[in-house]
Each structure stands twice: as C-alpha cells, then as structure tokens.
Amino acid sequence: MLDLESGPVHLSVEEGIGGTSLCLSLTATVLQSNSRVVWLGRSPLNSERAQAILAELNETQLERLFILEFGNNLLARATALKPLINRLTDTDLLVIDDWCPSSGRAPANDLQAVRGLISSAGNTRLILTSKAYESPSGDGNKWKSRGSQLSGVRQVWLLRQEGFRLSLIHISEPTRPY
C-alpha cells in the first residue's frame, strides 16, 4: 500500500482519520514476519487501540517491538537511539508518529532529528507521520504538509473524501537524497 521498500514515506494525516492505526497495522505485519519495529511517538499510544490491533501477535513477536515516547524532545531521543537504529535491517521498520507538533511550523530541532533518523536508518523501512493542515493561502491546494522541508521522502496523504471514509493519495516522489 505505501511501498516502504522504495524509501522513507512522510504520511500527512487529516486529524482523527486513523494515521496511528494505519501505522500500528503496518507494525503488526512487520512483527508477524519476524522483523523488528522501533516506534517513536510524540505522545503515548492509546493502549486499547494498540492492544486491539496487535492482539494477534505472540509474545516473541511483541518482544521485537520497541516503543518510546519523545514528547517535545525528539532530537535527544533520536541521538540516544542512533546505535539501535544503525543496527536495523531492510526488513525492520522505524515509525516516527507525530514527528512535529500539530500546529505552527516544524521546529528546527525536530527537522534536524528527522533528517538524522532518515540518514541513520539507511535502507530500513521508515514512515513519518504528521498532521496535515488546511491551507490558508487559497492557492488551489486545500491541504499542506509540515514535512515539506524534508527532501528524499515520498509524500503520502491520508484524508477524508466525499463518499469514502479515508483515502490514500500518493503525491510526490523524492527529488533529492535525504
């Protein structure tokens, strides 16, 4: 669906539509294939939702899931986790959920952290999520992404559309290396 083997993906999500649930489903699939997942989240996962989505996994599979909350300090967590992330393989997955705050511009420290994580991850499958926001400019594009400052990532949108509960819309390919 997201073709994570083709490089890092930035998923811009309309609030409340299920971006974290989508990433948890991808996490379950990766863990079922006996690979590892490192999950970095700005806030704690909803335990009921996580339990429901990961319910089919056994203890051995769940032992390969590393979940860390970074709050407002992604850069410090990213720096501390660099040795672990350097050991991930192309079958593993790195999820950075809500990598930047949901209002305003992405802080310089968060951008620095994400660029470092992308570089450290190498060929590891990587997905970044952030909240999409409605464009105030009236330039014809209703939605904007907080990840527009990131190069080397594919931009994907998860938005509500008339007649559909949710829709994935592929927008762009990376134009430059990370």
Which residue ranges define each predicted feature?
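Pre-Walker A adenine-sensing motif
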Residues: 1-3
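Ser/Thr-centric signal marking residues that sit
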Residues: 20, 129, 175-176
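Single conserved hydrophobic/aromatic residue that forms the stacking wall/gate
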Residues: 169-178
